[in-house]
A protein has these predicted regions:
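Thiol-based oxidoreductase modules, predominantly thioredoxin-like and allied folds used
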Residues: 5-6, 25-40
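Non-catalytic, surface beta->alpha helical segment in thiol-disulfide oxidoreductase systems
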Residues: 55-80
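Chalcogenol-based redox active-site neighborhoods
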Residues: 44-45, 72
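Structural micro-motif
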Residues: 45-54
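Short, surface-exposed acidic/glycine-rich loop or hinge patches that mediate macromolecular interfaces
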Residues: 8-11, 36, 69
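Local sequence-structure signature of Cys/Sec-based thiol-disulfide redox active-site neighborhoods
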Residues: 1-24
Length: 80
């Protein structure tokens, strides 16, 4: 399992989410994806807004999605 974090440098909620993630011990690795630098990947996942977290299985199958700035509690509940 891994988490894809879709964000952009100009996105204030993305920066707040990154600070929240930095303070957490997550059960899965997080891969940061800048939608401006990797628009094809953002399109492949149908990203319509940032920040967006996508949980993937080891086979690359999407297990869940969380859109917008979220609290630590929201993120941990989503991952459980």
């Amino acid at each position: 399992m891994k988490v894809l974090k879709f964000s952009a440098e100009w996105c204030a909620p993305c920066k707040m989410l990154q600070k929240t993630l930095d303070e957490m011990v997550l059960p899965y690795p997080v891969e940061n994806i800048d939608i401006d630098k990797q628009p094809d990947l953002a399109g492949e996942f149908g990203i319509r807004g940032v920040p967006t977290l996508v949980l993937l299985t080891g086979e690359g199958v999407e297990q869940g999605r969380l859109v917008g700035g979220k609290s630590k509690a929201d993120i941990m509940e989503w991952l459980s």
